[in-house]
Amino acid sequence: TDTSTEEPTLETIAYTRKKRSGQLAASLDHLPTETIHYRLSEEEQVCLCCGEKTHEMSTQVRRELKIIPAQVEVVEHVQHIYSCRHCEKEGTETPIVTAKMPAPMYPGSLASPSAMAYLMSQKYSEGLPLYRQEKQLERMGVSLSRQTMANWMIYGAHIWLIHIYQHLQKKLRAEDIAHADETSVQVLNEPGRAATSKSYMWMYRTGRDVSPIILYEYQPTRAKEHPKAFLEGFSGYLHVDGYAGYHHVSNVQLVGCWAHARRKFDEALKSLPVALQKSDQPCGAKTGLQFCNRLFAMDKKINQRKDCTPALRYEERLKQSQPVLDDFLAWLQTEQQRVAPKSKLGEAIIYCLNQWSKLITFLEDGRLELDNNRGERAIKPFVIGRKAWLFSTSQKGAKASAMIYSIVETAKENDLDPLKYLTYVLEQLPLIDLTDEA
C-alpha cells in the first residue's frame, strides 16, 4: 500500500433551513379564541416559605387548536297569523294579517342556504362525493339520500347560481385577454348517446392583470361551435393549447402555449437512451429544449424586476426574446429537412412550426403570458374532483356542476371562503328582485 497517497477530501454539504418560528401562531390570530384561566384558590395563595399571602407576578400561556365538527340542527319557521276579535264579535268582515316570513330558497324541501352551501362546498371544493356525504350525514343522525342532495344542488344552481354565472360571463366577455382549456367528462344519461360517450367540460378564465373569473361550461362534444358561442362578444387575445377548435372563435388572436412546445421536446429527449439523455453529447431534442428554456428564463427574469410593468415586459421581450425566436425558427426549419417527421423529435418540430404564428403572439402585448399554465391550473380542480365522483348522471347535473365549480373556483381565486360565499349568495339571492337587470 502506498501510504504517501492522500485520501480524497470528502465534502460535506449541509442545508440550513430558516426556522419558521411564530408563523403558525400568527396565522391563528384571526380565529375565535376561548381563554381558560387557572388560578390558585384563596387557601393555596400562601407562601410555602413564610406563610404570607402571595401575589400574582406573571402568567404563562399555552395555545392549542380545538376543532368543532359540523353539526346539524332543525330550524322551524313559525309564521304567526292575526285577526281582530272585536270585528269577529261585531260580525263584520274580519281582517287577517300574517307576519312576514322570508320565502324559502327551495319550496317544499328541507334545504336551507347553509345546508345547500355545505353540500356544494363538500363536493366541489373539498372533493367529497355524494355517497360519502350520505354516509357522513348518517353518522350525524340525518338520513339524506344522495339523490336528494343531487336534486338540491341542481335546483340551487339552475334557479339561483345561474344569475351570478351569467353576470360573470358578461364580465369575462368584456375583457380583452382570456384563457381557455377543456377536458373530458362522462355523462350517463345524454339523449341519443351511449353512457360511455365522451363529453367535455370547457373552461374559460380572465388574465393575470384583472379580477379573477373562472367559468366552466358543460357541452356534449368538443365541437368548434361551443367556444365560439360561449365567447360571443369577446374580442382580444385568447390563450390556448394547440387544439384547432379555437380557430373558429370570432374576433380573437390566439396565443400559443410554450409549455406545450417545451413538453414536446422533453418527450423527445425522454424517448432517447438514458445514457444519451444524461451525457453532454448534443442532440436535437436537447437543443430544442434549450431554446424553450431560454425563453422561460428570460421571462422569469423580467417578471422578477421590481419595476416590471406590461410596457416594460413588452420592450424587454422585443430586445431579449425576439432574437432567440429568430434563431429557434431558423433551427426548426433546418432540422425539419433532416429529421423523420414521425419521430418524437420530428413531432416536436412540426408542432412548433404549425403553431409558430400563435407561439410568437406573446410579443404583441406585455400583458400576455408565455404559456397557458394559468388556464391549465384553473381546470385542474375539476380534473381532481372527477377522480372522486367519476361521472355525472344527467345533462342537467353536468350543467349544475359547471356552474357550482365556476362559483367555487372564482371565490377561491378572489381569496374568499367558498362555503361562506355560497351560504351568503344563497341567503341573499332569494331576497333580490332578479328581474331588475340594473
Residue ranges with predicted function:
Residues 1-110, 179-180, 206:
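Short, flexible loop/hinge motifs at secondary-structure junctions
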Residues 2-7, 25, 39, 44, ...:
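Gly/Pro-rich turn-and-neighbor structural signature
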Residues 46-50, 84, 119, 133, ...:
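Mobile genetic element proteins and their domesticated derivatives, centered on retroelements
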Residues 51, 65-176, 408:
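Short, positively charged, Gly/Tyr-enriched micro-motifs
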Residues 56-58, 92-95, 187-189, 212-214, ...:
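Short helix/loop capping segments that flank catalytic or ligand/cofactor-binding pockets
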Residues 113-117, 123-129, 216-249, 398-405:
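Structured ligand/cofactor/substrate-binding pocket environments in proteins
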Residues 177-178, 242, 250-290:
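Conserved beta-strand -> loop -> alpha-helix junction used to position metal-binding or nucleic-acid-contacting
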Residues 235, 243-247, 282-438:
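Acidic/histidine-rich catalytic cores and adjacent linkers
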